[in-house]
């Protein structure tokens, strides 16, 4: 039996300004609320700085430190952690857990975007499952890249009995919720997760049970 903890990153400056952020690397605002102490053995997140910063904020409550690891490229090849003691927790970083790419909408204020493209069109881009903004991704695209990664790596760790923390963005979190809770394509567009929102599941023999919703 293991636990899955799903945490959405804390609020960034662009979130405050109501901008489409997507893959733009924007840092967090000052975290001014109490972060719960979480029990986990391994962490997965994206390379976006707002997610990495959230991971570091969570580790402020831990007596171990994070070691960031990568799945490909020079960062993977150069990594040698064999000589480290056991006082650390691995944090695996992958673009598969990135936020939805909003294409030409990235950086635009949402009110300005509605004036430029029309309120109805922007609403459909944001709240449909398959529609794609110019140069961007749909929620379905996020599901297609996040779910195979989740099944290959994260669920494997859960099956081995490890407690896993995922620090995700809104749409990568929704992709995981869709898989874990078996949410339909139609219903997932109505699922919301606030900044700093946290879900905790029990994983036992391939079955997920929601324990806590913070």
Residue ranges and their predicted role:
Residues 4, 52-53, 59-67, 148-209:
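Active-site-adjacent alpha-helix immediately C-terminal to a catalytic or transition-state-stabilizing loop
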Residues 7, 94-96, 211-213:
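Conserved beta-strand termini and adjacent loop/short-helix elements that scaffold enzyme active sites
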Residues 16-17, 103, 177:
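Short, function-defining helix-loop hinge/capping sites that tune catalysis or transport
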């Amino acid at each position: 039996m293991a636990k899955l903890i799903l945490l959405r990153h804390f609020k960034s400056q662009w979130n405050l300004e109501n901008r489409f952020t997507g893959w733009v690397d924007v840092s967090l605002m000052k975290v001014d609320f109490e972060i719960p102490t979480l029990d986990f053995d391994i962490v997965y997140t994206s390379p976006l700085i707002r997610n990495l910063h959230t991971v570091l904020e969570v580790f402020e409550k831990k007596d171990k430190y994070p070691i960031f690891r990568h799945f490909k490229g020079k960062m993977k090849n150069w990594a040698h952690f064999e000589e480290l003691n056991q006082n650390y927790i691995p944090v695996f970083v992958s673009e598969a857990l990135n936020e939805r790419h909003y294409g030409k909408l990235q950086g635009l204020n949402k009110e300005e975007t509605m004036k430029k493209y029309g309120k109805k069109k922007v609403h459909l881009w944001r709240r449909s499952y398959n529609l794609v903004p110019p140069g961007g991704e749909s929620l379905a695209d996020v599901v297609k890249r996040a779910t195979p990664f989740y099944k290959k790596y994260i669920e494997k760790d859960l099956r081995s009995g490890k407690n896993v923390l995922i620090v995700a963005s809104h749409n990568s979190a929704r992709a995981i919720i869709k898989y874990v809770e078996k949410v339909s394509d139609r219903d997932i567009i109505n699922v919301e997760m606030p900044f700093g929102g946290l879900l905790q599941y029990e994983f036992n023999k391939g079955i997920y049970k929601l324990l806590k919703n913070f």
